[in-house]
């Protein structure tokens, strides 16, 4: 089990902020979350003031990999809150996460907290995944019996994003979007999978709306949000969605333009002192040669997720618990 402890032995990313409050550098998040995020003495972020729900989950079984842990924890936490009748889960499936929210593993514990997606993305960090006693070199999850395609909740209008709006984005970015993603953005920008999509090879739960194009600055605007993610990605990559446990990004410059990558949060492989360039070279995980290939990898609402999550909740291995005091969210 030594692999599960590697993340605890090295200084976490952004360790220099230990014991300090980190404020959001952009105006939208700074206005919504003026109190920032406190980093504890060990360099782990304390997102508790922003938590809207919390779940305690049992210790993982022997031999679990980090992708298995992240996925099982997320769907079990959602199932526990769904079973508890929490209002945020009224409009999503039993194992999906409410839109605009993501699960955070609290460092050194088996507590999970539901926090706003844009808060979790403030900076690279170590927390409860990096400190978990699992195999951090073991990737992927168990194969599914059947791979059903993922479906998106498309708008009733003909397009989500107009050609004119896409051209405006490209003008702002300084390059043409990769073709497969460009077509997707026009058809389904701002849309989310119906229920949840799963990338089995990486255990990535895709249950949040993809970014879109907005007339005003917003954390779901493709151009604006990428300005907020410079601790995670170089400008060779364009983030297109928040997913459970990290970011989904496209390669937009250099080699393999259009390829799709997963940038995990709370990654035991991450180290303090690395540049953003070093992080993308060492930490990003491939999940499709282009955006069409990525979508084809996704399994739509695999029943295995609900089965596992139900067993966790029914067996008392995942249960909702009270949240701590909340920080006011403005705007």
What are the residue ranges of the model-derived segments?
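Structured loops at beta-to-helix junctions and adjacent beta-edge loops in soluble globular domains
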Residues: 58-60, 117, 241-243, 253, ...
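Acidic, proline/glycine-rich low-complexity IDRs
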Residues: 135, 142, 291-331
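A surface-exposed partner-binding patch
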Residues: 143-247, 306, 319-331
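Short, well-ordered strand-loop elements centered on a beta-strand within folded domains, enriched
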Residues: 65-68, 113-114, 254-267
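Nuclease and nuclease-like effector domains acting on nucleic acids or nucleotide cofactors
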Residues: 1-102, 106-147
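Short, solvent-exposed loop/turn segments at secondary-structure junctions
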Residues: 108-110, 120-122, 190, 244-248, ...
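Compact, glycine/acidic-enriched structural inserts
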Residues: 261-297
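Short, surface-exposed beta-strand/loop micro-motifs that present aromatic residues
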Residues: 104, 239, 247-253
């Amino acid at each position: 089990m030594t692999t599960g402890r590697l993340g605890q032995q090295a200084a976490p990313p952004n360790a220099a902020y230990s014991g300090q409050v980190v404020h959001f550098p952009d105006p939208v998040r700074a206005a919504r979350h003026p109190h920032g995020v406190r980093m504890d003495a060990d360099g782990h972020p304390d997102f508790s003031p922003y938590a809207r729900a919390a779940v305690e989950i049992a210790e993982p079984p022997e031999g679990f990999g980090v992708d298995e842990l992240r996925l099982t924890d997320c769907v079990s936490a959602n199932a526990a809150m769904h079973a508890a009748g929490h209002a945020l889960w009224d409009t999503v499936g039993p194992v999906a996460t409410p839109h605009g929210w993501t699960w955070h593993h609290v460092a050194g514990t088996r507590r999970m907290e539901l926090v706003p997606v844009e808060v979790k993305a403030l900076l690279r960090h170590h927390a409860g995944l990096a400190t978990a006693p699992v195999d951090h070199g073991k990737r992927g999850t168990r194969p599914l019996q059947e791979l059903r395609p993922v479906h998106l909740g498309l708008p009733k209008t003909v397009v989500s994003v107009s050609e004119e709006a896409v051209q405006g984005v490209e003008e702002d970015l300084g390059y043409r979007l990769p073709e497969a993603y460009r077509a997707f953005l026009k058809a389904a920008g701002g849309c989310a999978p119906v229920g949840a999509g799963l990338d089995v090879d990486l255990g990535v739960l895709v249950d949040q709306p993809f970014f879109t194009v907005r007339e005003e600055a917003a954390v779901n605007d493709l151009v604006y949000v990428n300005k907020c993610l410079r601790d995670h990605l170089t400008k060779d990559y364009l983030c297109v969605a928040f997913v459970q446990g990290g970011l989904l990004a496209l390669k937009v410059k250099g080699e393999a333009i259009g390829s799709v990558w997963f940038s995990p949060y709370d990654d035991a492989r991450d180290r303090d002192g690395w540049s953003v360039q070093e992080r993308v070279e060492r930490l990003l995980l491939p999940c499709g040669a282009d955006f069409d290939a990525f979508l084809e990898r996704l399994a739509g609402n695999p029943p295995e997720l609900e089965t596992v999550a139900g067993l966790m909740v029914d067996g008392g291995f995942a249960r909702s618990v009270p949240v701590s005091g909340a920080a006011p969210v403005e705007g």
